[in-house]
């Protein structure tokens, strides 16, 4: 929370003299990310956005009480965090690339769809198969986001003359975001190969 607060102060200081309208939008979108993070961590600390779920039959942790309430610890609030923070990142990147509104809208809608269906995958307890169906739908939305980032916006950035900085941020974003579906599949929500603590730290690092 403290780190996010310091980030906000730094962004406000750096953007105090920004006058170009597009640059202002990029600045505001970037500023929203640590603001959302503060809300997320506050919800986590207060226990508002976490819970214990009983995994469905077929899941590796089915019938195993990993918490005092007899279920698997599930910090589901992080999906809400991503549903607000990742669109802001995409808006900043899209504006930096000089993209049009159609591509920007498509990327943001696909991103929100990815997060919401990811939440559905995490909260589904009636069927192990349905968890993976939701996961597959979420990954399909993710493919749309990746296509726009890697193909469409890369071309737009060349035209806008911002290719150097955009490509750097693009690679960083894609590499980090690829970790989410991987850790979901290997973590307690999926195959349960990795411990909950490991996946939580991994998500925090990304």
From Swiss-Prot:
InterPro entries: Arc/bac/fun_rhodopsins, Rhodopsin_retinal_BS. It is a multi-pass membrane protein. PANTHER family: BACTERIORHODOPSIN _OPSIN, NOPA (EUROFUNG) (PTHR28286:SF2), PTHR28286. Light-driven chloride pump. Keywords: Cell membrane, Chloride, Chromophore, Ion transport, Membrane, Photoreceptor protein, Receptor, Retinal protein, Sensory transduction, Transmembrane, Transmembrane helix, Transport. This is Halorhodopsin. GO terms for biological process: phototransduction.
């Amino acid at each position: 929370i403290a780190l996010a607060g310091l980030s906000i102060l730094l962004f406000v200081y750096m953007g105090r003299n920004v006058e170009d309208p597009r640059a202002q939008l990029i600045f505001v979108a970037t500023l929203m990310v640590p603001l959302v993070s503060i809300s997320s961590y506050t919800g986590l600390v207060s226990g508002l956005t976490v819970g214990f779920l009983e995994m469905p039959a077929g899941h590796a942790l089915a019938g195993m009480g990993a918490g005092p309430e007899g279920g698997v610890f599930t910090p589901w609030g992080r999906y809400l965090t991503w549903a607000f923070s990742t669109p802001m990142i995409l808006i900043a990147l899209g504006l930096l690339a000089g993209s049009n509104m159609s591509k920007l809208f498509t990327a943001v809608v696909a991103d929100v769809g990815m997060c919401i269906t990811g939440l559905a995958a995490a909260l589904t307890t009636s069927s192990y198969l349905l968890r993976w169906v939701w996961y597959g739908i979420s990954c399909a939305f993710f493919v749309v986001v990746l296509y726009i980032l890697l193909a469409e916006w890369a071309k737009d950035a060349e035209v806008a003359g911002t290719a150097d900085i955009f490509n750097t941020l693009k690679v960083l974003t894609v590499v980090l975001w690829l970790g989410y579906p991987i850790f979901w599949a290997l973590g307690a929500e999926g195959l349960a190969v990795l411990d909950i603590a490991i996946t939580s730290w991994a998500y925090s690092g990304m």
